[in-house]
From Swiss-Prot:
Organism taxonomic ancestry: Bacteria, Pseudomonadati, Pseudomonadota, Gammaproteobacteria, Alteromonadales
Function: Could be involved in insertion of integral membrane proteins into the membrane.
The protein's name in its UniProt record: Putative membrane protein insertion efficiency factor
Membrane topology: Peripheral membrane protein
Keyword Cell cycle in annotation: no
A Pfam family that the UniProt record links to this protein: YidD
Organism: Shewanella oneidensis (strain ATCC 700550 / JCM 31522 / CIP 106686 / LMG 19005 / NCIMB 14063 / MR-1)
NCBIfam families named among the record's database cross-references: membrane protein insertion efficiency factor YidD
Xref: SMART domains: Haemolytic (SM01234)
InterPro entries linked: Membr_insert_effic_factor_YidD (IPR002696)
Coiled coil: none
Amino acid sequence: MAQTQSPLQWLATTLIRGYQIFISPILGPRCRFNPTCSHYAIEAIKVHGTAKGCWFALKRILKCHPLHPGGSDPVPPKNDRCNK
């Protein structure tokens, strides 16, 4: 069953998709990571919600610079402590 998005999740992912469609092609491929920072941000928001997902995305974007080696950096899984 598909999980519905909150209005904030929808807004955040729509803004990121807008970046992917309109701005990223102009700038060209620059991300040092796999998945790219914008894909990472969308996945983090879907998995962790808007606030925590945006926090993960911001931390990831701050690491995306020439001095960082980059590489594979998947979204961390959701930690459901209440279900254990």
